[in-house]
Design a protein with these regions (language model features):
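Short loop/turn segments that connect beta-strands within beta-propeller blades
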Residues: 6-10, 53-57, 106
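A short beta-strand motif characteristic of beta-propeller blades
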Residues: 10-15, 58-63
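Repeated scaffold domains used in trafficking and secretory/extracellular systems
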Residues: 19-26, 67-74
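Hydrophobic beta-strand positions that form the internal "hydrophobic ladder"
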Residues: 31-33, 81
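Short, solvent-exposed loop/turn segments at conserved positions within beta-propeller repeat blades
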Residues: 40-47, 91-98
């Protein structure tokens, strides 16, 4: 989850991702978040990069990856997002994902 506050410290909203947020990068009023493992529900559809409008928490984009996304970066103009995926082993021994560099255009 990501908790967002105003500059005066008052709580604004909470954004709840479907998996663990591994890293967050910012460009203006948007945030790109790397979403990785979900050890509670094993929801592998949660893996990927999510782009959020920081003004209201609206999800602008979601870019799915097969494996957990470990790192993310967003360009200064907010138009491009890069992410690093890594493989993971599921509880039943299946390997999902691979070591990959992803570049997405918004």
């Amino acid at each position: 989850s990501m908790f967002v506050f105003n500059y005066d410290g008052t709580f604004k909203y909470k954004y709840k991702a479907l998996g663990t947020m591994e890293q967050i990068d910012f460009s203006g009023n948007i945030a790109a978040c790397a979403v990785g493992r979900n050890v509670r529900t094993h929801n592998y559809a949660a893996h990927g990069a999510v782009v959020i409008d920081l003004n209201d928490g609206a999800e602008l984009n979601f870019f799915h990856t097969d494996g957990p996304l470990q790192a993310v970066a967003i360009s200064t103009n907010g138009r491009n997002v890069a992410g690093i995926e890594a493989p993971a082993v599921t509880p039943d021994g299946k390997i999902i994902g691979a070591y990959k560099l992803h570049i997405w255009h918004r």
